[in-house]
Regions:
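ATP-dependent small-molecule kinase phosphotransfer cores
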Residues: 37-108
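P-loop (Walker A) phosphate-binding loop of NTP-binding proteins
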Residues: 9
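Short beta-strand-centered segment that lines the nucleotide-binding/catalytic pocket of NTP-utilizing
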Residues: 27-40
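Walker A/P-loop
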Residues: 15
Length: 138
């Protein structure tokens, strides 16, 4: 499996480009933002750490993390946000790494879409990285 990273700034069209490539090439697509939610599900790698750190008040009646309650905390406290990012980003990278390991011998293309390609080290998992760039309007 050949791994292509797709990155770009907010509003650059990276999601559009990734979805078009998925459609045209029949590629598998991993979206880091969505994986951030996956790794917070009960039984997943980041769930226990997050609940232990922030407490039961962020747990919904169904046992999942109440993302609205968590957002209220992390968007009003930079230290809490930094802590959460230090848990989520490595968990997402590990999820991607596991997916690559499981599929490495298969043919085809795996696309990884993330705005934080280099900041998280995700680029090291890719065979190549494509940047989607749109210049600012003047």
């Amino acid at each position: 499996m050949y791994v292509i990273g797709i990155t770009g700034g907010v509003g650059s069209g990276k999601s559009y480009a990734a979805h078009r490539l998925q459609e045209k090439l029949g590629a598998t697509l991993l979206i880091a933002d969505e994986l951030g939610h996956v790794v917070m599900e009960p039984g997943r790698s980041a769930y226990c750490q997050i609940v232990e750190h922030f407490g039961q008040n962020i747990v919904s009646s169904d046992g999942s993390i109440d993302r609205v309650a968590l957002a209220e905390i992390v968007f009003s406290d930079a230290r809490a946000r930094d802590w959460l990012n230090q848990v989520i980003h490595p968990a997402v990278i590990e999820y991607i790494r596991d997916t690559i390991r499981q599929n490495r011998t298969r043919s085809g293309i795996l696309l990884i879409e993330t705005a934080l390609m280099y900041e998280t080290g995700c680029d090291s998992l890719c065979d190549e990285v494509w940047l989607v760039y749109v210049p600012e309007e003047e």
